[in-house]
């Protein structure tokens, strides 16, 4: 048993990053192996780690146990003290654990005014800490979603740089990438990544004070602090965090008092080498209604784009999601769905749920391409058409948050002229329409106007990285 567990840990070290080994595998303690029942019992230090290991690593441990014992083995996880069976000693070193009371105290201190220091008292034996309760307190205060981890984040060309940066931040918070600014369209995995960072840091067991907050909630916190005249408490809490995760910061637009308070929190945390991670739907300099001081601070760290997933990545996402649902999905079925639905991860997952529900309600035990065609016929009728100028106009208008009617109008403000020129450029690049035909579809404009727009955007694309990125995103959205 002892020899097996040492071999198991060694094998997992070859498959998993060091941080995961330290956070999840080394804290486990093998208790016993029941030869008759082929059951391996393993203890986890608290409920938080137990649930996580059972969900993310049990299949790997069971596979290694089956290989070692030459038979299928069931691995069960339990908390210390739930059984009288003796523990098996391990030669593998384990990290020093932070006491649960210290974690609880740190969390409480982060959210409440510090009470007066109590008078010294004689040392007394401490009661056994409620590990599961402490883990739950950390989780509830952090507002992290424990389902969003690095382990179940599908990586491809569209997000590999963002994932690499996120891993680096999780392992070395508050150093070179501070703040980390992730931007991209809806449903591309920004929220998943920042939760993964928070979960990894909490799991490392160092008692870090973490808070995930959507920008709207932060605004609400500021308003409540103002109404209750409790800004000192508000500042004490946010300034004391080790990791602050702000999602969709574009919602700070026009909220001057919120931006002012966030600026103070930002300055305080960075000065203490505490990590800040921000997501947005656009590049920092393209944020409207945001104080220039904040935009300057955002640019001082690392800014990484997450783009729409390419075909191979979309297939991998579908296969991973189907596996998590316990449903076998042939690769050709995943390929069919991925080929026709191209915009983002949420759309893919929604389509998969629709297919699974259709198959279940109609008694289809096996997923096939025909089942997908039936289940997704409404979605496919929209996505199957060729790229048209009308589709380009709508996609560009949605991206720049203007009306489609602005594409045909004679108005020329900058916030309309640029999107219109971008749409003309894409119409020339992605359709077979002639310049006069494109001009007609843009409110009867002359072909020389279209030619001017095409040349202007083409030249600017070669010189401006932000515009090139925008065009790349639009092209991939339109043609997959």
Curated annotation (Swiss-Prot):
Q: Which PROSITE patterns match?
A: DNAA
Q: Where is this region: Domain III, AAA+ region?
A: 143-359
Report one GO cellular component.
cytoplasm
Q: Where is this region: Domain II?
A: 71-142
Q: Which UniProt keywords apply?
A: ATP-binding, Cytoplasm, DNA replication, DNA-binding, Lipid-binding, Nucleotide-binding
Q: Which GO MF terms does the UniProt record name?
A: ATP binding; ATP hydrolysis activity; DNA replication origin binding; lipid binding
Q: Which Pfam family, any one, appears in the UniProt record?
A: DnaA_N
Region labeled Domain IV, binds dsDNA — which residues? 360-480
- Comment, domains: Domain I is involved in oligomerization and binding regulators, domain II is flexibile and of varying length in different bacteria, domain III forms the AAA+ region, while domain IV binds dsDNA.
What role is this protein assigned? Answer: Plays an essential role in the initiation and regulation of chromosomal replication. ATP-DnaA binds to the origin of replication (oriC) to initiate formation of the DNA replication initiation complex once per cell cycle. Binds the DnaA box (a 9 base pair repeat at the origin) and separates the double-stranded (ds)DNA. Forms a right-handed helical filament on oriC DNA; dsDNA binds to the exterior of the filament while single-stranded (ss)DNA is stabiized in the filament's interior.
Q: What is this protein called?
A: Chromosomal replication initiator protein DnaA
Name the gene: dnaA
